[in-house]
UniProtKB/Swiss-Prot annotation:
<dbReference type="GO" id="GO:0000287">
    <property type="term" value="F:magnesium ion binding"/>
</dbReference>
<protein>
    <recommendedName>
        <fullName>Ribonuclease HI</fullName>
        <ecNumber>3.1.26.4</ecNumber>
    </recommendedName>
</protein>
<feature type="binding site">
    <location>
        <position position="70"/>
    </location>
    <ligand>
        <name>Mg(2+) 1</name>
    </ligand>
</feature>
<keyword id="KW-0460">Magnesium</keyword>
<comment type="function">
    <text>Endonuclease that specifically degrades the RNA of RNA-DNA hybrids.</text>
</comment>
<feature type="binding site">
    <location>
        <position position="10"/>
    </location>
    <ligand>
        <name>Mg(2+) 2</name>
    </ligand>
</feature>
<dbReference type="InterPro" id="IPR022892">
    <property type="entry name" value="RNaseHI"/>
</dbReference>
<dbReference type="Pfam" id="PF00075">
    <property type="entry name" value="RNase_H"/>
</dbReference>
<dbReference type="GO" id="GO:0004523">
    <property type="term" value="F:RNA-DNA hybrid ribonuclease activity"/>
</dbReference>
<dbReference type="InterPro" id="IPR002156">
    <property type="entry name" value="RNaseH_domain"/>
</dbReference>
<dbReference type="GO" id="GO:0043137">
    <property type="term" value="P:DNA replication, removal of RNA primer"/>
</dbReference>
<dbReference type="InterPro" id="IPR050092">
    <property type="entry name" value="RNase_H"/>
</dbReference>
<dbReference type="InterPro" id="IPR036397">
    <property type="entry name" value="RNaseH_sf"/>
</dbReference>
<dbReference type="GO" id="GO:0003676">
    <property type="term" value="F:nucleic acid binding"/>
</dbReference>
<comment type="similarity">
    <text>Belongs to the RNase H family.</text>
</comment>
<keyword id="KW-0255">Endonuclease</keyword>
<dbReference type="InterPro" id="IPR012337">
    <property type="entry name" value="RNaseH-like_sf"/>
</dbReference>
Length: 154
């Protein structure tokens, strides 16, 4: 039987672009694990995406996943927009390169390993796990240790 894992993610950026971070809560049965990391220069969308990528990469085997994010960009991108981007060779409808294609491709690869049910919650609305992720992401952004090598200034 496939394990069911709950994942909650959030990204934060102090300035956009600026220092950023992600926060993750993973829950399997009654066990919770938190992850976070800060980056010196990035964007809020990249941190939202990276949170989902890292969370899914953390799972050692294919799982049934309920992934909750407060990012419509991530949820809509992976459930709706990505299909046409792939058909067009990672180009938008107006033939421009898809922003954050490196992370979209990583997220696409990870979602193929798992059975993911995407959920959206309003940020800063008292959702327990989202508030934990937000705090983890903000704290990580305030203490960045990594470089976001995929970040490309527009």
């Amino acid at each position: 039987m496939t394990k069911h894992v709950e994942i909650f993610t959030d990204g934060s950026c102090l300035g956009n672009p600026g220092p950023g971070g992600y926060g993750i809560v993973l829950r399997y049965k009654d066990v919770e694990k938190t992850l976070s990391k800060g980056y010196t220069l990035t964007t809020n969308n990249r941190m939202e995406m990276l949170a989902a990528v890292v969370a899914l990469q953390t799972l050692k085997e294919p799982c049934r996943v309920t992934l909750t994010t407060d990012s419509q960009y991530v949820r809509q991108g992976i459930t709706q927009w990505i299909h046409n981007w792939k058909k067009r060779g990672w180009k938008t409808a107006d033939k421009k390169p898809v922003k954050n294609a490196d992370l979209w491709q990583a997220l696409d690869k990870e979602t193929a390993r798992h059975q993911v049910d995407w959920h959206w919650v309003k940020g800063h609305a008292g959702h327990r796990e989202n508030e934990i992720c937000d705090e983890l992401a903000r704290t990580a952004a305030e203490n960045p240790t990594e470089e976001d090598t995929g970040y490309q200034p527009s």
